[in-house]
Amino acid sequence: MLSVENGLDPRAAIQVIKKKLVGSVKALQKQHVSLDTVVTSEDGDANTMCSALEAVFIHGLHAKHIRAEAGGKRKKHTHQKALPQPVFWPLLKAITHRHIVSDLEHLVFINTDVGRCRAWLRLALNDGLMECYLKLLLQEPARLCEYYQPTALLRDAEEAEFLLSFLQGLTSLSFELSYKSAILNEWTLTPLSLSGLCPLSELDPLTTSGAELQRKESLDSISHSSGSEDIEVQHSGHKIRRNRKLTASSLSLDTASSSQLSCSLNSDSCLLQENGPKSPDHSEEPMSYDSDLGMANTDDPDRSLQEVLSEFSKAQVNSAPSSGPNQEPDTPMFQTPLSLHSLATSTHLHFEGSEELFPAHKSSGTSSGGHKHQLLPQETPDEKQLGTAQAGPAQSTSDQQPSSPVGGAAGQGSGPWKALEYGRVGPKLVVSSPTSPKGKSWISEDDFCRPPQEPALKSAAGLCTSPVQDTPESRAALHGPFSQGPRKSCSLGALDKACVPSQACGNAQPAPAPAPAPAPAPAPAPGVTQDHKNFCVVHRRQMGLSNPFRGLMKLGTVARRGAMGIWKEFFCELSPLEFRLYLSDEERTCVESCSLLRCEAVGPAHSDGRFELVFSGKKLALRASSQDEAEDWLDRVREALQKVRPQQEDEWVNIQYPDQAEDAPEAPPDSLPPYSTLLPEPAGAQGMQLDWTSAQVPEPDAIKESLLYLYADRTWVPYIFSLSLESLKCFRVRNNEKMLSDSHGVETIRDILPDTSLGGPAFFKIITAKAVLKLQAKNTEEATHWRDLVRKVLASYLESAEEAVTLGGSLDEKCQEVLKFATRENGFLLQYLVAIPTEKGLDSQGCFCAGCSRQIGFSFVRPKLCAFSGLYYCDFCHQDDASVIPARIIHNWDLTKRPVCRQALKFLAQIRAQPLINLQLVNASLYEHVERMHLIGRSREQLKLLGDYLGLCRSGALKELCKRLSHRNYLLESPHRFSVADLQQIAEGVYEGFLKALIEFASQHVYHCDLCTQRGFICQICHHQDIIFPFEFDTTVRCAECRTVFHQSCQAVVRKGCPRCARRRKYQEQNVVS
């Protein structure tokens, strides 16, 4: 296999892919969910996520689907190894709508199947259909076997289930990734290395150990299509050709880098902005850097590299500059990124070896020889230099070994080009910006507005012994990780790891006296520790251990206090939206499920591990194994609450921003961007005049209908929303007429919440199964009215749904709990179990599939009607599976099999063995009008009476009868409760024979058992010695009052009342007289 010969073992590659995917998605959620911003191609974590998803589809491909050829620019360099080019476009076409396939195949700059695969992935993320596509793919095992090996990730049921559950976290993100760029026509090194087709050492040449390799993440790549950059590389003292002329493409290959996402220019139109129209063959390879400049010190294996780096960065940012004789003038700490125009200028790099600055160490054989990097053009006042500290003994050098090429670090997004300059104070980050137009600052929000802290200064000052340790370069050397574009990620890039301070900084500058022995890294200062209060979880995450809970935030065993004060252990799972309690880890029976959207309070952790979670209408008293474990649970719950709830602010202040003139001078490069550009938020009424007038006629079934503004495509669009007891409809007004734009069933509405973070109390959002609707009302009162009405409609629906679950009180509590667990996903289908659905038409669904929300209709996919629910589905969700409809059997005695959707078929399979239908309550007249049901009801009553006899017998016959029941013990409890399996057997004509066999077995036991015969009756009319039984319906009759059994013939001859009842009345009269 290619994955074994050329790269990692398939199982090891899966773990690498999962780690990349988990880290990038969590970083994107942390950055974008709270701010409701859109993820673009400029985000470094989006690059990593796309590379990991590409690796998912590449991992385990059969060799026949992998072309072993180099593409494009790589052919020009014979010394470069050919990159494999896996292709799975035919597989993707099989699960994709033909219109989307046509659009991708007609893209101007995408002319290869590889490009279509990569463009398809980004388009799926933009449309929010990645989870849906993966479900469809996993439901096609034959196609997967054709394309993938048995060890592939997509053919591993457990790993595929984890991937599917983890991708649900993408629903909280909005993507606008570029998918039309020509650079997508070839695979880059990152997804190929992650999937195991290429060695990871080629992706990261300075990394030697596999354990350290998993901890590293490649530096975010810059994608640029201009071909005017010429880069010269000079090496002294190495076996590399001097003055080698490199283009952006060759430099990318020389450093074994990869372009992880399509293009930072967001669309192919940007390719034409500066260089005019270009064909895909002439577009340049994106310039990106993935090689690390060193390795971090790993003396403490329990301490996360991320935590150490964060501590030193915060300590250095918070420290105040100290004056010294060697202190250089302060350089600006913030730099606006270069625009595309500035990137068009020529940039050159020179590398000159300086081996004297880097002594050899015996602890590692990895060569990281020093190079002196400087820009050929004259430095301008706009240049910014940041010194980076040299890594410690973990990245030793060797004088006899030639240094491997060191890739320059390039900022992500629209950030400037950066080159490393190794001076006498260590490597410096030099940014040349001849023209500095406005742009987003690459400094993150955590890097400014912090008061100076003296303890942190002292802690950071103790790390280096150099006399010039307080220069701006040395202060910047400890400032890491570098913020990259709009990214605010906790994951470490290659440049971040190179800038980790080592145990001593004696090599930073030559000193007259020999440097002292390296001292262990000091503990974090109190100021730094105080900054770590922003950590969401204080135990496993701060120790640097990965999340072991497979997509969940936390799971474990917790005791819960019951109504009688008795503690009982449950297995608990905390997901981003729910807190669930199971009976045990092995028995996956959910006994409680609480939505975090309705969490009202989180109690403190006590010394014995007790803590409380308060939800609307209930309070959970829980107890963990220790106080630390309880605090860990509470921290995870608070973290989840921060993600699902809007940030509340106590006070609102309206700030009026003056309009800026068009010819206003640009801000200096060293100035901070305004606060409004740091936190992008939807432009509300302050930026545009909203028209609230509407003269449309309300819908006939509307409870509430008014004009609201919906936030879509970064602007507020007016819509007319109509709320009824069944749905929430969205209309667009065109030519003074209402046109249905979308429709959300009440069963799909999860909650409605105020969202003051959008601009004020008049903003709110409705959370549905398909999307999150961000709305703006005319005023606060109107928004409050909408929220109250939607909550009342939801409460009404939930009450009716609960009544449908209990089916009129015919289910006991245990059966209800089992039913709720079995129908957690498809609970809204319960209402159609005993009621014939009404076909409402395709317009009521807004021309969307009721299963996957795809557009259906005559101009799209042909809609298919589900006979069970009366809803319309697409051809993927409805594959013409046939089944009997229980409601039609109950009410119409219609035994015909009708086509149902896959969702309904799965629902019927889940509840197949549950006795949910009480025929006596739903339609008792069916016994009278249908002869077969009359006989079945009679047999069910006989079996019930026989079950009472066998239940009192000590011979063990009841166990034997239960084996013959096939887990239908409810047949012995109630004669009127039926399951879907019973109705299906009735329709097939095998149910009567099944009951007769059970009656024959039970009656034979009663007749021949000494204990059971003694519980028989003697006819009190004829007083015959024959023993009679109540289940002998053909020869006996039973008194309805005292339940005494008589011969049917004797009762007909006497024609009097029950003699036993007559005696009882006589005794009662005598007692009254006496």
Curated annotation (Swiss-Prot):
PANTHER family for this protein: PLECKSTRIN HOMOLOGY DOMAIN CONTAINING PROTEIN, PLECKSTRIN HOMOLOGY DOMAIN-CONTAINING FAMILY M MEMBER 1
Keyword Cytoplasm: no
InterPro entries xrefs: DEF8, PE/DAG-bd, PH-like_dom_sf, PH_domain, PLEKHM1_PH, RH_dom, Run_dom, Run_dom_sf
TM segment ranges: none
Locus of motif LIR: 649-655
Domain RUN: 40-182
Gene Ontology, cellular component aspect: autolysosome; autolysosome membrane; late endosome membrane; lysosome; nucleolus; nucleoplasm
GO BP annotations listed: autophagosome-lysosome fusion; late endosome to lysosome transport; lysosome localization; positive regulation of bone resorption; positive regulation of ruffle assembly; protein transport
Pro residues composition bias: residue spans: 511-525
Gene3D superfamilies (UniProt xref): 1.20.58.900, Pleckstrin-homology domain (PH domain)/Phosphotyrosine-binding domain (PTB) (2.30.29.30)
Record PTM Phosphoserine, positions in chain: S218, S433, S436, S491
Annotated region (Interaction with RAB7A), positions in chain: 672-1074
Protein's UniProt name: Pleckstrin homology domain-containing family M member 1
This protein's UniProt keywords: Autophagy, Cytoplasmic vesicle, Endosome, Lysosome, Membrane, Metal-binding, Phosphoprotein, Protein transport, Repeat, Transport, Zinc, Zinc-finger
